[in-house]
């Protein structure tokens, strides 16, 4: 109780202790002057927002929740994936893998699929957590999962990307041309499955065969500029990404050629698509969210909104639901914007750790997870709005 211990936890390895610091020594002024503390006053400005329920898992959470059939599925740093009631947050069941879970799971047809750093991909019964199948790979599996028409798409760190039948656990196809590891949530668009990796490349594969259709890379060399953390979106024949080079890019979905690319707004690793597929959204690295047209062949900015979240680099995607753009930040702040104007509708702070991509159930309800271990359901009553 009187010390802080520092550990290094490399993926796939046991945590290693690096140091310890006593909490009994006075290493700061007693007045605390000049040392700002976490501020939750924003919640008083927006009383229409509240937490219907909040659960503290006790472990760090690095992924978004998955939602299916009124249930919430969350993987954590202990290697456990747990199922909660979306109504009240009560835990229904928990299944333990051997190492941490980094990627966002997906659930459909009573099967929940996820990857683990223990080098396996799992399929569980979504109702009771019973193991249905397990696929062993050759490296930690950190990628998020997308399920479409009974097929799960997921990338690993073994230079492979797989399509898996979720009922049988059979690998439908495997693409072994990936040069780096994968963390993103794959996009299924028309006949393609699209994903980035930490190897500079954005890949497009035939979703039925796994054959490479095209591979995109533009900009500075080096894997640290890869469009690997962003979850790609697509509409009107174009794929949209944002990368660490602070560029927002539209790519021809058929050819893999760049349609337009702009650094005007200094966005980074976030992109979202409007429900009518006419607009895209992205967070900038300082305070703002921007909106661009998804229909033009040039970068047309529609609006920019000063949300006031400060310096920002969390790869948490903006998501539109029923005319509201839901977003989150590295400092525990969530917000809602008018999708057509960018007007700030609400903000709410639940902690001081990174909030992963939100999962709105409607414009009034939103699931969230935080790196600090929190899982919850946010409720917004738009009839109550005292904010001026």
Regions found by a protein language model. Give the residues of each.
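Short coil/turn segments within WD40 beta-propeller repeats
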Residues: 78-80, 118-120, 158-160, 199-200, ...
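Short, low-complexity, Pro/Ser/Thr/Gly-rich segments in the mature regions of secreted, periplasmic
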Residues: 376-387
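Beta-propeller domains
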Residues: 76-80, 84-86
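Extracytoplasmic beta-rich repeat domains
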Residues: 12-66, 78, 92-108, 131-148, ...
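Short loop/turn segments that connect beta-strands within beta-propeller blades
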Residues: 10, 85-88, 125-128, 165-169, ...
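Residue-level marker for isolated small/hydroxyl-bearing positions within beta-strands
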Residues: 75, 115, 155, 196, ...
């Amino acid at each position: 109780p009187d010390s802080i211990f520092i550990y290094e936890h490399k993926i796939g390895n046991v945590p290693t202790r690096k140091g310890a610091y006593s909490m009994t020594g006075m290493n700061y002024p007693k007045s605390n002057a000049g040392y700002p503390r976490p501020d939750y006053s924003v919640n008083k400005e927006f009383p229409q927002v509240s937490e219907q329920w909040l659960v503290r898992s006790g472990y760090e959470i690095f992924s978004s929740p998955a939602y299916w059939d009124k249930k919430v599925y969350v993987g954590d740093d202990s290697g456990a994936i747990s199922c909660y009631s979306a109504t009240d947050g009560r835990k229904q069941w928990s299944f333990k893998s051997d190492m941490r879970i980094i990627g966002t799971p997906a659930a459909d047809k009573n099967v929940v699929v996820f990857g683990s750093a223990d080098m396996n991909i799992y399929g569980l019964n979504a109702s009771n957590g019973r193991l249905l199948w397990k696929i062993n790979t050759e490296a930690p599996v950190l990628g998020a999962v997308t399920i479409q028409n009974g097929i799960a798409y997921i990338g690993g760190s073994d230079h492979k990307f797989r399509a898996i039948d979720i009922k049988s656990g059979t690998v439908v196809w495997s693409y072994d041309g990936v040069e780096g590891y994968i963390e993103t949530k794959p996009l299924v668009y028309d006949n393609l499955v699209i994903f980035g990796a930490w190897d500079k490349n954005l890949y497009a594969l035939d979703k039925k065969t796994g054959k490479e259709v095209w591979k995109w890379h533009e900009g500075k060399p080096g894997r640290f500029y890869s469009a690997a953390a962003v979850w790609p979106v697509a509409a009107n024949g174009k794929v949209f990404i944002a990368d660490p080079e602070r560029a927002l890019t539209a790519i021809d979905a058929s050819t893999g050629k760049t349609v337009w690319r702009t650094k005007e707004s200094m966005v980074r690793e976030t992109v979202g698509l409007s429900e009518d597929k006419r607009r895209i959204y992205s967070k900038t690295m300082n305070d703002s969210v921007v909106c661009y047209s998804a229909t033009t062949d040039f970068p047309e900015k529609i609006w920019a909104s000063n949300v006031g979240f400060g310096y920002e680099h969390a790869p948490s995607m903006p998501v539109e639901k029923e005319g509201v753009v839901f977003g989150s930040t590295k400092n525990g702040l969530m917000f809602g914007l008018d999708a057509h104007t960018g007007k700030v509708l609400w903000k709410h702070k639940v902690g001081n750790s990174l909030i992963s991509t939100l999962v709105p159930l409607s414009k009034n309800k939103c699931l969230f997870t935080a790196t600090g271990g929190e899982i919850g359901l946010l409720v917004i009553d738009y009839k109550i709005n005292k904010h001026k």
